[in-house]
Amino acid sequence: MQTYGNPDTTYGWWAGNSGVANRSGKFIAAHVAHAGLIVFWAGAFTLFELSRFDPSVPMGQQPLIALPHLATLGIGFDADGVLMGDTKPVLAIAIVHLVSSMVLAAGGLLHSLLLPGNLEESEVAKARKFNIEWDNPDKLTFILGHHLIILGFAVILLVEWARVHGVYDPAIGAVRQVEYDLNLAEIWNHQTDFLLIDDLEDVMGGHAFLAFVLITGGAWHIATKQVGEYTKFKGKGLLSAEAVLSWSLAGIGWMAIIAAFWSASNTTVYPVEFFGEPLELKFSISPYWIDTVDLPDGVYTSRAWLANVHYYFGFFFIQGHLWHALRALGFDFKRVTNAISNIDSATVTLKD
């Protein structure tokens, strides 16, 4: 955390990062508990949506988020968004998420209450390898590598699910198995027109390529270390918890904004049957999307919820990135508030 040269700086309870930034064990506890909250939301919200799901109304015209994603994965619903037979598959997914959230919560409590607050104090040699040193690029790249590999395997799970089980293809109105297409020329070309992609083979091919890049990059970061002397040109003095947080916020903010535009317009990854018709982009104080079909007052399609929520989350994540990036560079925001509060008593002296 930025202290502006004052080693005795204290933070209020609301500055949660201040309590874990330099204590890697507590840092892991916070991350595991946060993951548990996310997984709990997924399970609980699936049950909530299932309890409110109306089979007489098209799924795309209901304010749903979790159920349409399950439908695109070929779980629980037919091509018209109607429950197939019973709710057991959907209930099973929700319960697995709830149980997993309990395991993650227990892991968070374990790291918070019983295990060392700092991994440097751990009796396990492998655990000490993951002790965070913010201005040590070798430590950070080692930890980053493991994150990238885990993300790569998560992407592989999606690709293999589509290949073995199948996903919903709006082109034929049914769930089908999708073999990924590793045509590198196509993947390269879709960098500029990915919002218009209309072929599931290309979608899965892009994900397969992404998995390869993530796992290869992860292995590279684990195996390699800083070449030569660690200088200011390479980031010495810049690497900090605040800087890493700012970069993380920039990444997730950018992804959220891309997801907003993609979910608003693409009907292959976000089928009309499950998410509703494509949206119309409007501008006011900020951009926003509106439904292009007539719906009762206060009712919005899944697509409208997804696009707008992702965009505004992304927008504020980017603001958080700028805030923390400036703090990491040493900018003191208190100077701004002090300048504003003293504006009435400020004097201007003119010199000849």
UniProtKB/Swiss-Prot annotation:
GO biological process annotation, one example: photosynthetic electron transport chain
Pfam families, sorted: PSII (PF00421)
GO MF terms held by the record: chlorophyll binding
Transmembrane segment boundaries: 27-47, 90-110, 142-162, 203-223, 243-263, 306-326
Induction annotation: As the light levels increase antenna complex levels decrease. Transcript expression level is unaffected by iron concentration.
Key words, A-Z: Chlorophyll, Chromophore, Membrane, Photosynthesis, Photosystem I, Photosystem II, Thylakoid, Transmembrane, Transmembrane helix
Residues spanning the signal sequence: none
GO cellular component, one term: plasma membrane-derived thylakoid membrane
Chief localisation class: membrane
Compartments where found: Cellular thylakoid membrane
Cofactor: divinyl chlorophyll a; divinyl chlorophyll b
Family indicated by similarity: Belongs to the PsbB/PsbC family. IsiA/Pcb subfamily.
Function description: The antenna complex functions as a light receptor, it captures and delivers excitation energy to photosystem II and possibly to photosystem I. The Prochlorales pcb genes are not related to higher plant LHCs.
Note, other: This high-light-adapted strain contains only 1 pcb gene.
Subunit annotation: The antenna complex consists of divinyl chlorophylls (a and b) and divinyl chlorophyll a/b binding proteins and binds less divinyl chlorophyll b than does low-light-adapted Prochlorococcus. Also forms complexes with PSII, consisting of a PSII dimer and 4 or 8 PcbA subunits. These complexes are also found under conditions of iron-starvation.
Descriptive protein name: Divinyl chlorophyll a/b light-harvesting protein PcbA
Organism: Prochlorococcus marinus subsp. pastoris (strain CCMP1986 / NIES-2087 / MED4)
